Every structure is written in structure tokens, then in C-alpha cells.
Swiss-Prot record:
This is Phenylpropanoylacetyl-CoA synthase. CDD domains: CHS_like (cd00831). Catalyzes the formation of feruloyldiketide-CoA by condensing feruloyl-CoA and malonyl-CoA in the curcuminoid biosynthesis. Has no activity with cinnamoyl-CoA. One of its GO terms (molecular function) is acyltransferase activity, transferring groups other than amino-acyl groups. It comes from Curcuma longa (Turmeric). The keyword Transferase applies. The active site is at 163. It is an enzyme of class 2 (transferase).
Length: 389
């Protein structure tokens, strides 16, 4: 057999499809209104009253009601180096994340596999994505062991991609599913804020936004082409997936891993940069499918912050309810980096069923998942919803 014939024989017939979704969060929940008092107390920073007032304003404007955080007061007291703004603390942080990240991923993955309904031994590929710590072997292998997956599972580990990585994981899973007949890909995003948690300092205002916005969570999907009738229940079809880097925008958002942990920089122009470029990205992705009416699409938009959602909504002329699922996830969980857009897909399919819609996409046929992250990179995933029984 020639190479081309082999490729055709071993490729799937249909598009990649999301077959199951599972999510998980740490049990520790923080109330956003009460968090400024807790944060300044636990970091021994009550004397910084002006900074505390600024932090409170940031929390109030974030459109977040609560978040889940792995770091409890007990853990923080046991690791005082995490509390100081610029103290050498990488070893302490790393010791926490190498256990926390795969553990949280396991919870989400088990839920997804249970919903999927097939034996976990049928998983052929694993895509693991996290910006929370680096180790070799990585969290992908740890998760494989925790789940008891076959050692023959083909693994892809995506470290430190950034907040757009939920879209990246979907793009990679799509390619694996469509180019390997019968493949079932477990795609997992697991994020904890352990590396970026630190006390306040007047010289590091950007860190206040990180402490106010970010939360911890993991999401897992099972992705595969050609669903088995009567066994697998498709949720969304992945029609296309693409990435673009915006020119001359590298300094808009980024993170740097240092001895003090992970530090983020977020330029105030970030929302406007995204909004001014978003329509071009959407047109490039959607025009081949004949999609141009943005209000006839369902939306899963990475909530990097309230201002980003507001400006994207305004630029595209979206009706207020179009970003309802996105804003709900931001309110209940904060920005969970790569996992957030996958939480939004889960929220969307659940509320679509609860509200009696005909499809998993709020009654609409087509939709878009958008991820924004360092680069500045935009992931655009075009989805087709599936019928609800």
C-alpha cells in the first residue's frame, strides 16, 4: 500500500466531536466581596490601606461572585515564602503543584470518562495542558497513572501555553481524532494559581489584578470522530480550529517563571487590542462556512477580564444574552486560564438542556470558541451544535 492510501485508510470519515465534558474545582471557595479582607490579613499587609482600597475596587469591578482556590489559609501558613511579594519561593510552589495539578485533572477526567460511557481502556490519546508548574515526566504521565490508562496511550504535554490554551488543546485533539481512525482523545486542562500567588506590593500593581481575577479548576473532554450510535452522545462537532498571533502585540500579556514564581504582565490596552482584531479573526474562520451574522452564533469567549468581554461584545454588536454562559462562568469561577472556555462549553450545553433548547448551542446551529493569551495569540474554534433529545 502506498503512503497516501495508508493515510486515507487510517483517517476518520467525519469531523472531530466532543463526546463528553467533565469539570472539577478545589473545595476551598472564596467570596469575592470578602476576599480583600482575607488577602491582606493572611499576607500580613493590613498596613497597606491605600493598596487594600485599590484591591477592593478591582475585586468589585471584576464581575466575579466567587472563586475556587487550592491554597487555603492552612497551606499558606505552612509556606510563608508564598506570602512575601518577591521572596525566593519556587521550590515550595513546585512541591505543591506537582501533586495538585494532576489530582485536580483526575477529578475532571473521571467525570468525563463516566459521561462518555465507554471503558477508559478505549482512550488512545491524551492531551494535557497546564501553565501550573513544570516537571519531567510531566502531569500527563501522572494523570495516566492516576486514571489507570494503558501505557500505550499517546501523550502530548502542553506546558505554559497561556490563557488561550483551552482552544489549543481542542485544536490538537481535533487533529489527532481526525487523522487516526477510531481514536478517542482525552483532552485535559488543569490550572492552579499556586505559582502566581503572592502578597501585595505598591511597586507591583499588575499582581493585584492576578490575585483578584484568577481561580483554580480543571476541565476534561473526550474527543473523537465517527461516534458510535447508541453508545456515544455527541455534544459539539469541531468544524475548524485555527490560531493567529497579532503583530506587534507580544508585550500586551505574558508571564515569566522565576525564582519568585510566575509573574504576569497585563497591559491596560489588552481589551482594546483584542477587540480591534477580533472581527478579522472571526471572518477568516467563519467565512468559509458562510457565517457572518454574529448574533446567530453561540459564544464561548475566554473571560480574561470583564473589560475584554465588554469590548468584544460592543465591537461585534452582540446582543446581551449571547455571552450569558461566558459571564456566568466568570462570575462563579473567575479566570481559570486554559480550563475556562471548556467550563463555558459545559455550562452552555447544560443550560441549553435546562431551558428546553433544541440544540446544545442555545438552540443555534453554529458557534465560536475564542481563546486569548500570550503572543498575543487568538485561538478560534468553530463549533456545530448537536440536537438535544
Amino acid at each position: 500500500m502506498e503512503a497516501n492510501g495508508y493515510r486515507i485508510t487510517h483517517s476518520a470519515d467525519g469531523p472531530a466531536t466532543i463526546l463528553a465534558i467533565g469539570t472539577a474545582n478545589p473545595t476551598n471557595v472564596v467570596d469575592q466581596n470578602a476576599y480583600p479582607d482575607f488577602y491582606f490579613r493572611v499576607t500580613n499587609s493590613e498596613y497597606l490601606q491605600e493598596l487594600k482600597a485599590k484591591f477592593r475596587r478591582i475585586c468589585e469591578k471584576a464581575a466575579i461572585r466567587k472563586r475556587h482556590l487550592y491554597l487555603t489559609e492552612e497551606i499558606l501558613r505552612e509556606n510563608p515564602s508564598l506570602l512575601a511579594p518577591m521572596a525566593p519561593s519556587f521550590d515550595a510552589r513546585q512541591a505543591i503543584v506537582v501533586e495538585a495539578v494532576p489530582k485536580l485533572a483526575k477529578e475532571a477526567a473521571e467525570k468525563a470518562i463516566k459521561e462518555w460511557g465507554r471503558p477508559k481502556s478505549d482512550i488512545t490519546h491524551l492531551v494535557f495542558c497546564s501553565a501550573s508548574g513544570i516537571d519531567m515526566p510531566g502531569s500527563d504521565l501522572q494523570l495516566l497513572k492516576l486514571l489507570g490508562l494503558p501505557p500505550s496511550v499517546n501523550r502530548v504535554m502542553l506546558y505554559n501555553v497561556g490563557c488561550h490554551a483551552g482552544g489549543t488543546a481542542l485544536r490538537v485533539a481535533k487533529d489527532l481524532a481526525e487523522n487516526n481512525r477510531g481514536a478517542r482523545v482525552l483532552a485535559v486542562c488543569s490550572e492552579v494559581t499556586v505559582l502566581s500567588y503572592r502578597g501585595p506590593h505598591p511597586a507591583h500593581i499588575e499582581s493585584l489584578f492576578v490575585q483578584a481575577l484568577f481561580g483554580d479548576g480543571a476541565a476534561a473532554l473526550v474527543v473523537g470522530s465517527d461516534p458510535v450510535d447508541g453508545v456515544e452522545r455527541p455534544i459539539f462537532e469541531i468544524a475548524s480550529a485555527s490560531q493567529v498571533m497579532l503583530p506587534e502585540s507580544a508585550e500586551a500579556v505574558g508571564g515569566h517563571l522565576r525564582e519568585i514564581g510566575l509573574t504576569f504582565h497585563l497591559k491596560s490596552q489588552l481589551p482594546s487590542i483584542i477587540a480591534s482584531n477580533i472581527e478579522q479573526s472571526l471572518t477568516t474562520a467563519c467565512s468559509p462556512l458562510g457565517l457572518s451574522d454574529w448574533n446567530q452564533l453561540f459564544w464561548a469567549v475566554h473571560p480574561g477580564g470583564r473589560a475584554i468581554l465588554d469590548q468584544v461584545e460592543a465591537r461585534l454588536g452582540l446582543e446581551k444574552d449571547r455571552l450569558a454562559a461566558t459571564r456566568h462562568v466568570l462570575s462563579e469561577y473567575g479566570n481559570m486560564q486554559s480550563a475556562t472556555v471548556l467550563f463555558i462549553l459545559d455550562e452552555m450545553r447544560n443550560r441549553s438542556a435546562a431551558e428546553g433548547h433544541a440544540t446544545t448551542g442555545e438552540g443555534l446551529d453554529w458557534g465560536v470558541l475564542l481563546g486569548f493569551g500570550p503572543g498575543l495569540s487568538i485561538e478560534t474554534v468553530v463549533l456545530h451544535s448537536c440536537r438535544l433529545n
